Amino acid sequence: MSIEEHKQLVLRWREELWNKRNVDALDEMCAPDYVGHIAGFPELVRGREACKQMFSAWLASFDVRVSPEFLFAEGDLVAVRDSIWAKSVADFQGIPPTGKEGTLTSTDLYRIANGQVKEQWFEADYTGFLQRLGFGAR
């Protein structure tokens, strides 16, 4: 794949998962041996099925919209900074929904291999984000 194709894969990943809520798109875009380094998670997310579970859990709790602010790529790596809007719509880790909405920016780095996302690094201020949504300090 070309660098431009890598960038298009990452843009599609974000659109399908967050904006279209299509977790099944991971069957095509996510490598079976995916590794996710997700800020705030105590352990690595390992494998396509674990990745699907992670996204499904977030999408069950929040209405989310993601807009990329910028994107660049070199070799097999793609970096993107996103502006994220979310609203609490269902239980989150046993806490009832607050109905509040908030914004967040994130920085993601993706490693592409064989036309799929093989590895992802996600950084964001989860604590501030959850406080803005009314969940208090975590």
Name each model feature, range by range.
Residues 1-138:
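C-terminal and inter-domain tail/linker signature
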